[in-house]
């Protein structure tokens, strides 16, 4: 008897479940609430057990009776150590963590089985691969035990990244009755190739992937990743740019794109997040006063704070382009005679020895000056009060003589504190003593372009080689607080499968700059008619050379710097409105579509055309907004619908199925019109064949252009979709 597809179990496996390592932890953690609302206790997250993080992340429970508990007890009886309980986050999902160390005695047997099964080699000294193999076999073991006991309902297993994906080919080979989805957040080979300064996107189709992986010593890892992608029922990526990359490097065209989202906290009133910006900005101002003591000759009310942040990947994160653009911006501002000062922060962790003496001294002397001024102010206030109390109207004046307010002792104290601010050196460009100062790429480029924080420079630079936290003695802010206090985030990445940093800026109402080689940049560019009107600037790194891209970025920085305060406030309001596009309440629909597509492929007979299709028109409750909400490229779509999993246009590339029903963007920065926010999913009719779904692949430089045959096929497919006209197809490049 076939399994029921109406109440399936969902297992989601990732290396970062209850174990913060990187960005996938954020994806899993923030997505949980919407998934729990759909599945309840039919959802269980699976990951490796970290004895360091598990005690503070998970509340242990005993599994109850039933197929799930029986499967766990069966494994425990055979020596498997595991932790089952509730993840202590919003939604409190069930979580199952396997202790890979408890099965290391089986590792050689499993490595041999993997070689016989798939021809995948496994070097003995690669600890990460060893962990991946053991974890993959343990997950496949559990799924087999559970599927043998739970025979009524369908089972969906969703795997994130190659470290968790090995269970997919094992389930396929063992004929375990589970439906599998594999999501790659970045390809292994892509990261290595981009870090090697190759012209990655223009040569993507020409790489000999086996040779390149072998040359870099990651062939065995690449094989695991590729087998996971090919054996999964549904293969997805997090962005179109990664889909294009996966098609050429993993040799399978993804079935769709599942963009990353965030849990968006909406404020009751528009002014609330503006107030948070002002409060956080004042804390940054305090740091700036200390850092630039002795050369603090600029107006903080006429200062723009920019920043870039992330892992220290000098080229992949576009730090080289950012610094070059800052140097050109500095030249232009000086040439214009501008009074505006730009302070650019670079927040990236690197090897350091300690804080610099100058950075610590600056904060200390300004703090002492502030305390001294407060003491003197209190004494002056007391003298004014005493004078007013003694005034009788017969002699003296109502207001004391200003010279009598400041005593000689106060004058000496103030002079000492002010003289302590004098210094002969320039403000430092880095807050820490670097472990390898002479070879640090960021410092070397700052020296090359001569950004040394000179008094005449309009652009000042501060490199903070450590992630932010509120206990920092120099810049004591958490990352979120710091972002809220800045005016602009700059992330001109060359390789960025999605990019949470610009997304976090958007949710907090901070304008940002990204590129069309980042997943987030592609997402916003394809979704909005004029993203720059809403504070999302996109640098073209796909269709033009480096010099042109640097000039474009410099122009965007200059344009933002010359905005008035009112224009910046209006733009922040619009940027904050974009947060609804990044909310999991909307983007969670894309994961639901992927799961349904997987079930349709595994159990086609369980679906019939008379059933309502959940990919039909679904209105997302978004009110009329003030100020104006973003205008979409098409009036009939959800935030992720341009990447939706459909089956009509299997042969078309991403650009073949972009909606083109344009809305005019806002041109006036001060315009505050009201108009609707049309978030409606495109209605689609099912194809007769369930063999494939749309490929979420983009075609950056080197990709093909649309042929007449492609356009005709797109027209035919869209003409079958209710309410969507055939002239909405766009071969957009």
UniProtKB/Swiss-Prot annotation:
It catalyses: [(1->4)-alpha-D-glucosyl](n) + UDP-alpha-D-glucose = [(1->4)-alpha-D-glucosyl](n+1) + UDP + H(+). UDP binds at residues 20, 311, 501. SUPFAM superfamilies: UDP-Glycosyltransferase/glycogen phosphorylase. GO terms for biological process: glycogen biosynthetic process. Disulfide bonds: none annotated. InterPro entries: Glycogen_synth (IPR008631). Allosteric activation by glucose-6-phosphate, and phosphorylation by a cAMP-dependent kinase. Belongs to the glycosyltransferase 3 family. This is Glycogen [starch] synthase. The lineage of its organism: Eukaryota, Fungi, Dikarya, Basidiomycota, Agaricomycotina. The gene is GSY1.
């Amino acid at each position: 008897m076939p399994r029921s597809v109406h109440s399936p179990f969902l297992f989601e496996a990732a290396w970062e479940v209850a174990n913060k390592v990187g960005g996938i932890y954020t994806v899993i953690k923030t997505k949980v609430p919407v998934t729990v609302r759909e599945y309840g206790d039919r959802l269980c997250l699976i990951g490796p057990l970290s004895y360091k993080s598990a005690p503070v992340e998970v509340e242990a429970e005993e599994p109850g009776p039933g197929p799930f508990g029986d499967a766990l007890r069966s494994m425990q009886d055979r020596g498997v150590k595991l932790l089952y309980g509730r993840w202590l986050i919003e939604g409190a999902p069930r979580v199952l963590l396997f202790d890979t160390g408890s099965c290391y005695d089986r590792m050689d047997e499993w490595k041999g089985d993997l070689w016989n099964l798939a021809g995948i080699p496994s070097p003995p000294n690669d600890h990460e691969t060893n962990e991946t193999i053991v974890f993959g076999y343990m997950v496949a073991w559990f799924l087999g035990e559970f599927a043998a006991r739970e025979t009524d309902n369908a089972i969906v297993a969703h795997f994130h990244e190659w470290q968790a994906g090995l269970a997919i080919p094992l389930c396929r080979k063992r004929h375990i009755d589970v439906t599998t989805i594999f999501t790659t957040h970045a390809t292994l080979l892509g990261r290595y190739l981009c870090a090697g300064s190759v012209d990655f996107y223009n040569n993507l189709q020409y790489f000999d992937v086996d040779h390149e992986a072998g040359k870099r010593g990651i062939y065995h890892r690449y094989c695991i990743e590729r087998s996971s992608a090919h054996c999964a029922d549904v293969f997805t990526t997090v962005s179109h740019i990664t889909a294009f990359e996966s098609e050429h490097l993993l040799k399978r065209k993804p079935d769709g794109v599942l963009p990353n989202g965030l849990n968006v906290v909406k404020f009751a009133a528009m002014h609330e997040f503006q107030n948070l910006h002002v409060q956080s900005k004042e804390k940054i101002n305090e740091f700036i006063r200390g850092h630039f003591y002795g050369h603090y000759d600029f107006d903080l009310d006429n200062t723009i704070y920019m920043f870039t942040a992330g892992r220290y990947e000098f080229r992949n994160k576009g730090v080289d382009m950012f610094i070059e653009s800052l140097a050109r911006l500095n030249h232009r501002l000086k040439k214009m005679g501008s009074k505006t000062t730009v302070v650019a922060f670079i927040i990236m962790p690197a090897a350091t020895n300690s804080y610099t003496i100058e950075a610590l001294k600056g904060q200390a002397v300004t703090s002492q000056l502030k305390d001294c001024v407060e003491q003197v102010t209190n004494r002056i206030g007391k003298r004014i009060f005493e004078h007013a109390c003694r005034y009788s109207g017969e002699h003296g004046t109502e207001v004391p003589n200003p010279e009598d307010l400041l005593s000689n002792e106060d004058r000496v104290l103030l002079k000492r504190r002010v003289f302590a601010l004098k210094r002969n050196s320039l403000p430092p460009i880095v807050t820490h003593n670097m472990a390898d100062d002479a070879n640090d790429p960021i410092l070397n480029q700052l020296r090359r372009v001569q950004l040394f924080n000179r008094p005449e420079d309009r652009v000042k630079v501060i490199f903070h080689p450590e992630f932010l936290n509120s206990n920092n003695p120099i810049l004591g802010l958490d990352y979120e607080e710091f972002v809220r206090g800045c005016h602009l985030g700059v992330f001109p990445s060359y390789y960025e499968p999605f990019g949470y940093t610009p997304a976090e800026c958007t949710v907090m109402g901070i304008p940002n700059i990204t590129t069309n080689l980042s997943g987030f940049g592609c997402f916003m560019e394809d979704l909005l008619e004029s993203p720059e009107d809403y504070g999302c600037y996109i640098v073209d790194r796909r269709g033009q050379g480096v010099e042109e891209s640097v000039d474009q970025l410099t122009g965007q920085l200059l344009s933002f710097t010359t905005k008035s305060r009112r224009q910046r406030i209006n733009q922040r309001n619009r940027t904050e409105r974009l947060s609804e596009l990044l909310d999991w309440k909307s983007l969670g629909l894309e994961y639901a579509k992927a799961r349904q597509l997987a079930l349709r492929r595994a159990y086609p007979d369980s679906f019939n055309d008379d059933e309502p299709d959940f990919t039909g028109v679904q209105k997302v409750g978004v009110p009329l907004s003030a100020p104006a909400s973003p205008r979409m490229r098409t009036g009939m779509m959800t935030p992720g619908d341009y990447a939706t999993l459909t089956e009509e246009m299997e042969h078309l590339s991403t650009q073949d199925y972009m909606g083109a029903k344009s809305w005019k963007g806002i041109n006036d920065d001060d315009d505050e019109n009201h108009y609707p926010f049309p978030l409606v999913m495109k209605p689609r009719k099912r194809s007769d064949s369930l063999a494939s779904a749309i490929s979420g692949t983009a075609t950056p430089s080197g990709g093909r252009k649309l042929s007449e045959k492609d356009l005709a096929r797109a027209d035919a497919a869209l003409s079958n979709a209710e309410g969507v006209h055939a002239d909405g197809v766009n071969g957009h490049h």
